[in-house]
């Protein structure tokens, strides 16, 4: 039998969207009980890419993100679009770039570092963050409404059978449906 914990909100995934949602919920109502699960061993463990980030979203969450030490350190200094050809390359003039390729005011970041920082901020606001737990199943009530999620079992053999250290997954149930 699975153990169960109850929350007002359960968020599956500790990427930028899940973390931003958890943070915003706690900023709006500090009393709300928010849980975030992440399949990786730590927040940011499964996010390996770099990115160019527009700081608008993080500014909306944390207007003083620079003073708080957010890892947005390298401002984009110039834009360049290069087409590689069989015999070399051709630079496209910057004025010909579509606006979606222009990155003035943006930052070159490690998305994993940003997620780790957001995870720290979420925990400081009172979000219960559980790394190392994958969401395995959506749980429904008798009317077909979502009532929570179940995490995956731990200690399974390679055939998917319970092994000697088997622990059933947890039910993370919603208090208000």
Functional labels for PLM-detected ranges:
Residues 26-47:
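Glycine-rich FAD pyrophosphate-binding loop
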Residues 9-33:
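N-terminal Rossmann-like FAD-binding beta1-loop-alpha1 element of flavoenzymes
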Residues 132-145:
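A conserved short coil-to-beta-strand element within the FAD-binding core of flavoproteins
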Residues 175-177:
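Conserved small/polar residues in nucleotide/adenosyl-binding loops
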Residues 101-120:
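Short beta-strand to alpha-helix junction loop
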Residues 100, 151-173:
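A structured beta-alpha segment of the ubiquitous adenosine-cofactor-binding alpha/beta core
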Residues 40-87:
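N-terminal FAD cofactor-binding segment of flavoenzymes
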Residues 1-6, 166-169:
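A short, basic/flexible loop-to-alpha-helix module at the beginning of a structural domain
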């Amino acid at each position: 039998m699975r153990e169960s914990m109850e929350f007002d909100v359960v968020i599956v995934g500790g990427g930028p969207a899940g973390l931003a949602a958890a943070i915003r919920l706690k900023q709006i109502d500090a009393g709300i009980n928010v849980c975030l699960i992440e399949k990786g061993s730590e927040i940011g463990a499964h996010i390996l890419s770099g990115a160019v980030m527009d700081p608008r979203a993080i500014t909306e969450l944390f207007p003083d993100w620079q003073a708080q030490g957010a890892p947005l350190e390298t401002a984009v200094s110039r834009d360049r679009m290069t087409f590689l050809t069989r015999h070399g390359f051709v630079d496209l003039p910057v004025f010909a770039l579509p606006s979606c390729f222009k990155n003035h005011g943006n930052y070159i970041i490690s998305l994993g570092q940003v997620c780790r920082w957001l995870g720290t901020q979420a925990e400081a606001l009172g979000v219960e963050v559980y790394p190392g737990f994958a969401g395995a199943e959506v749980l429904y009530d008798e009317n077909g409404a979502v009532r929570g999620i179940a995490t995956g079992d731990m200690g399974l053999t390679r055939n998917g059978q319970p092994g000697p250290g088997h622990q059933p997954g947890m039910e993370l149930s919603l208090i208000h449906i």
